[in-house]
């Protein structure tokens, strides 16, 4: 009942965007904060879905579309509204805004046909993020090398990949029996995470560029891969080290 009350209340707001981003030209309606709100909204909507009347489902779905779905997918994915590309901000902004919007779209697709269409666009575009070849003019390197390593240090790499995989797993769960599109980089991620960790007595350390804490780990990404059926012994070793 509380989740239902919260959802019916928050959809009355004018915007979920941040004041700083809304002041930009052009206006940025969706940032990392709004992407997280989209994710939380999707979880909440799914949790109370069976307890809502048909009119409440529609009302909440339309409100979440206006406040979160349209900004995330409109700014980051869908034409003609899109103002961003794969190399806007850090690369992980794209997966966060696009994929959290995609998860919300999956949650709303029973009520809103346009949400289902939006989720399909995100799903089809997702491999492009992993294949990003870099941008010479903006001095941005290729995201993943041939051996599976990412140019970001562990903290930011894990965040961007985790956002992508949460959407991919949600897509797989809502499309049982449909073979997911192949993303070759996923098979090599565990090797990357193992090679940038620093085994020691006690909590696992990782190597970084001074942009995160040495105790940050990537078990969330590996658990998502494992749930998708992408498994190997390195993953189990790594997750066991983190557990200890």
Give names to the regions the model predicted.
Residues 1-198, 202, 210:
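Aromatic-lined, polymer-binding surfaces characteristic
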